[in-house]
Amino acid sequence: MMTHTSAAPDQGKISFGGTNNGLVAKTIKFSGTASHAGGAPHLGVNALNAAMIAMSAIHAQRETYRDQDTIRIHPIITRGGVAVSSVPADVRMETYVRGASIDAFLSASEKVDRALRAGAMAVGGSVEITTLPGYLPIQSSQPMLEIYSRNAATLVGSDGLNRLGHRTGSTDMGDISQMIPVIHPYVEAATGNGHGIDYMVKDYTLGVLTGAKAMAMTVIDLLHENAATGQMVVDKYKAPLTKTDYLSLLRGMMKEESYTE
């Protein structure tokens, strides 16, 4: 059980339930040939152009993604070159590839890899792609949610509760949920945009004290009478993966690929 702050006070004070996207993470290196950008650009191979073409190719794939898969791909360039007067020969990019299911984000990941290779091919350069497992989609334990929601209602009232749908961010709690029962509620104690510079916890009592009380009350209910309720939660949970399955899945997501035109 983990509680996260959020910034949607119009939806209530405590939000819970719902699902999240999973993801893989990629680091990419485009390699070209340096040359004088003004005097002899024709002797260079522009790795920044390869990255730009790759990003355009990634965007061109967006119409192929199903709405229900909620694919999110958001690359950034972390190194664009070393000097304005030199054709960029070493350009670095990072991106996450997110989706509502494992199959969805792995399929999108393959499309991203094609786009990255296409960028390198177009300019006659090369690309190295490293893919790492990120987070898996989350699923919540319904019995735990029922216990938590009753406790949360005593703190903020029934009108202060909000049942979530699907959220397109990702969380490491998703990995845990593939093997054991979890819940991941939110306290709507912040303002601003999530992960933005303006994000700030405005309601400390709600964000820290009330959130902690709701979890503590739920823990007491789960452990009461020799953890009978906790055992019921465990017994009813249908885990998608065993530990062995989980490790095998993550290891299968890890790969390094090099492509040279």
Identify the function of each model-found stretch.
Residues 52-261:
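Metal-dependent amide/peptide-bond hydrolase catalytic core
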Residues 1-88:
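Histidine/acidic-residue-rich, glycine-tolerant segments that coordinate divalent metal ions
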